[in-house]
Amino acid sequence: MDTFSTKSLALQAQKKVLSKMASKAMVAVFVDNTSSEVLDELYQATKEFTRSRKEAQRVVKNLVKVAVKLAVLLRADQLDSNELAQLQRFRGRVRSLAMTALSFHQVDFTFDRRVLATGLLECRDLLHQAIGPHLTAKSHGRINHIFSHFANGDFLAALYSPAEPYRSHLCRICDGLGRMLDEGGI
């Protein structure tokens, strides 16, 4: 039996084209201003921490590519009810984690890197479960790269330290997260 499907082929082509276009211009199409500001601050903090512009670009580019692929899957109704339920759990966990990150920023001496790292790794696992069958091994690698970077305890400790420039980045990240939570973006 021939398993050729033009719908499947079109979806693959769409994901391939969009993955090649994950630039700052494409971010503007798929994310709002607040999300873009948060991504810019995450890029700056990552660049500062890794001391590598290339690595910081890679992390943010991978994040954008995964978000775009997820949007394509949702738009094309490719996820079944079980995968959509997993995605809802992922969204709920991300929202909870954003509130925790804000709380750690707003209340002195409450930061616990293990809580954030564990939460980020849980989000990674939920995302793999939700959209796993629809992605290539390379996309799964991107998801692992993104979450392993942001769940790195040393990165989190630096980000939440009172030292500059991390303090300013964290303030702007948390301002953006607060707006996204208020507007329902997370």
From Swiss-Prot:
Give the CC-aspect GO terms. Answer: cytoplasm
Q: Which keywords does UniProt give here? A: Cytoplasm
Q: What induces it?
A: Up-regulated by oxidative stress and by 6-hydroxydopamine (6-OHDA) in dopaminergic neurons.
> Where's it found, cell-wise?
Cytoplasm
UniProt keyword Transcription regulation, yes or no: no
Superkingdom of this entry's organism? Eukaryota
Q: What is this protein called?
A: Tumor necrosis factor alpha-induced protein 8-like protein 1
**Molecular functions per Gene Ontology:** identical protein binding
Which InterPro entries does this one have?
A: TNFAIP8-like, TNFAIP8_sf
> What biological-process GO terms show up in the record?
negative regulation of TOR signaling; regulation of apoptotic process
Q: Which Gene3D superfamilies match?
A: Tumor necrosis factor alpha-induced protein 8-like
**Subunit structure, interactors included:** Interacts with FBXW5; TNFAIP8L1 competes with TSC2 to bind FBXW5 increasing TSC2 stability by preventing its ubiquitination.
Family label: Belongs to the TNFAIP8 family.
Q: What does this chain do?
A: Acts as a negative regulator of mTOR activity.
- Name the principal localization, coarsely classed: cytoplasm
Free-text tissue specificity from the UniProt record: Detected in wide variety tissues, such as neurons in brain, hepatocytes, germ cells of female and male reproductive organs, muscular tissues and variety types of cells of the epithelial origin (at protein level).
